UniProtKB/Swiss-Prot annotation:
Classification via Gene3D superfamilies: Ribonuclease A-like domain
Gene Ontology MF, one: endonuclease activity
Coiled coil (residue ranges): none
UniProt KW Oxidoreductase keyword: no
Gene: BRN
Domain of life: Eukaryota
Location of region: Disordered: 1-25
Organism: Giraffa camelopardalis (Giraffe)
Residues the record lists as binding substrate: K7, R10, K41, P42, V43, N44, T45, K66, R85
Biased composition (Low complexity): 15-24
Protein name, per record: Brain ribonuclease
Keywords on record: Disulfide bond, Endonuclease, Glycoprotein, Hydrolase, Nuclease, Secreted
Glycosylation sites: N62, T129
Length: 141
C-alpha cells in the first residue's frame, strides 16, 4: 500500500520542472499522477522545488492546520508552485484543469519518523505571523 509520504510525493512533488509555458500541464500531470482515477480531484498543487527543500519545511514555522491539527508547518520562503483547479466544463472521465503558476509560501502537515510531509495544507502569498496580535517591530528578536 502507498505510504502517506509516498502519496504526498506522487500528488505534490514535481522537482526540477515548471509549468510556466504549458497551459496543458495540469491536464497531463493530474492524469499521469493518477488523480483522475474514479473521479476528478477538484484542486491540487504541485511544488517545483527539491524534495529536500520541501521536507525541510517540517522544521520551519509550526502553525495549526486547517482541520485544527497542530502538525502543520509553513515554509520560510516562497516556493515555485502550480495550482491545478478543475474547470467548470470538466466532467469525469474527461477531467479538465486550469493551470496557474505561482510563487507562494506553502503549508504542509508532517508526521512519522523521519518527520516528513504527508499532506499539502495550502499556500499563501504572505506568511502567517505566529500570533495575530504581534507588535510590528517584534521581528528578528
Amino acid at each position: 500500500k502507498e505510504t502517506a509520504a509516498a502519496k504526498f510525493r506522487r500528488q505534490h512533488m514535481d522537482s526540477g520542472s515548471s509549468s510556466s509555458s504549458n497551459s496543458n500541464y495540469c491536464n497531463q500531470m493530474m492524469k499521469r499522477r493518477r488523480m483522475t482515477h474514479g473521479r476528478c480531484k477538484p484542486v491540487n498543487t504541485f511544488v517545483h522545488e527539491s524534495l529536500a527543500d520541501v521536507k525541510a519545511v517540517c522544521s520551519q514555522k509550526n502553525i495549526t492546520c486547517k482541520n485544527g491539527q497542530p502538525n502543520c508547518y509553513q515554509s520560510n520562503s516562497t516556493m515555485n508552485i502550480t495550482d491545478c483547479r478543475e474547470t467548470g466544463s470538466s466532467k469525469y472521465p474527461n477531467c479538465a484543469y486550469k493551470t496557474s503558476q505561482k510563487q507562494k509560501y506553502i503549508t504542509v502537515a508532517c508526521e512519522g519518523n523521519p518527520y516528513v510531509p504527508v499532506h499539502f495544507d495550502g499556500s499563501v502569498l504572505l506568511p502567517a505571523t505566529s500570533t495575530q496580535a504581534q507588535a510590528p517591530l517584534a521581528r528578528g528578536q
